[in-house]
Amino acid sequence: MEAIVQAPTPEGVGIVRTQRMHWTTPLTLTSGATLGPITLAYETYGELAPDRSNAILILHALSGDAHAAGFHSPTDRKPGWWDAMIGPGRPFDTNRYFVICSNVIGGCRGSTGPSSPHPSDGRPYGSRFPLITIEDMVHAQQRLIDALGIDTLLAVAGGSMGGFQALAWTVEYPQRVRGAILLATSARSSPQTVAWNYIGRRAIMADPRWRGGDYYDSDAPRDGLAVARMLGHITYLCEEKLEQRFGRRVDGDALDLGPRFAIEHYLEHQAARFNDRFDANSYLVITRAMDNWDLTARYGSLTAAFDLTRARFLALAYSSDWLYPPAETYQMAAAAQAAGRSFTTHLITTDAGHDAFLTDVAAQSELIRDFLNRLMTE
């Protein structure tokens, strides 16, 4: 296969811009409802090979977006959410691969979601936005891949909800995906995960400022979204990391009901940051899509689902991940192997919890690099 080779640039992909693709033709959703027109925000890194064989689609988790790598301006304080993994010489090597990342439908970072204008009146969808599924997200992404002129993806890759999408790609479009990289993910949302998500949604809907989802002309339900984010953020860590990072350090009056412990201040900080960049209705819509994710229920058995796939799989599990624990990765491996599929699993020992797929770069880099190398040389 032919790939573009460029001179190395150790500083990463540099300054990038978010692009948008628009479609006037409505998307028919799993529910039978339609959504349209549709906009997808996306970014690309590297160059597409002349034979279009080197494209990799990166799929983000709940709070992610299209900005996976690089900076939007020289004054940006932080790069994209997976910058350490994408760039020249990095696992998703932009000297070799054409890397794409898009914001999911239902989101609030440039793609069509509840805060987008409704085509009938130009006002935000709000409560009128339809419920979507992980498969709906993938069907929208398929339009983007078509528009970019790509027939077959070298790989799809994602962690957490991004892993849901990667799996869905291999089932929905088996002839268009050669490899799938699954990190800290599962073939279904467990009852525990559904419970955490429900409590978060309940907090948002109990905020008087939610107003049934139609709050865009007034104050947003910041208190409810803050509680949802705090709860969710705890599930991304683990007890060992919390003890190591915060212990029982205090900064405040023991008789005050406000934040006193270091962990409380940390959660308040995370909630405030999240409120500044995320929409409460998007949180509701996306977490419900996550709850409904279940390949076994959709296809009768997990083995039957994998029987539909043609891709090679690399799955990374993380020892301290209690949101999508390693046992769920092993269940996928058993089902895939029963279906005769190539499914390689690695357990990474870490104290970073579920967030390890974002932070434990060194531990996972060579595994991903080697997997992609094999795909390119087959």
From Swiss-Prot:
Location in the cell reads: Cytoplasm
Pfam family for this entry, one: Abhydrolase_1
GO MF terms, alphabetically ordered: homoserine O-acetyltransferase activity
Gene Ontology cellular component terms for the protein in this record: cytoplasm
Name the pathway.
Amino-acid biosynthesis; L-methionine biosynthesis via de novo pathway; O-acetyl-L-homoserine from L-homoserine: step 1/1
Q: Does the keyword Transferase apply?
A: yes
Q: Which UniProt keywords apply?
A: Acyltransferase, Amino-acid biosynthesis, Cytoplasm, Methionine biosynthesis, Transferase
Q: Tell me, which GO biological process terms does this entry list?
A: methionine biosynthetic process
- Name the InterPro entries on file: AB_hydrolase_1 (IPR000073), AB_hydrolase_fold (IPR029058), HAT_MetX-like (IPR008220)
- What EC class does the entry list? transferase
Please state the Enzyme Commission number of this protein. Answer: 2.3.1.31
Active site, UniProt feature? S160, D321, H354
Q: Which reaction does it catalyse?
A: L-homoserine + acetyl-CoA = O-acetyl-L-homoserine + CoA
Q: Does Nucleus show up as a keyword for this record?
A: no
Quaternary structure and interacting proteins, as annotated:
Homodimer.
The family this protein is said to belong to: Belongs to the AB hydrolase superfamily. MetX family.
- State the protein's purpose: Transfers an acetyl group from acetyl-CoA to L-homoserine, forming acetyl-L-homoserine.
Instruction: Write down what this protein is called.
Output: Homoserine O-acetyltransferase
Q: Which organism is it from?
A: Chloroflexus aurantiacus (strain ATCC 29366 / DSM 635 / J-10-fl)
Ranked from the top, the taxonomy reads:
Bacteria, Bacillati, Chloroflexota, Chloroflexia, Chloroflexales
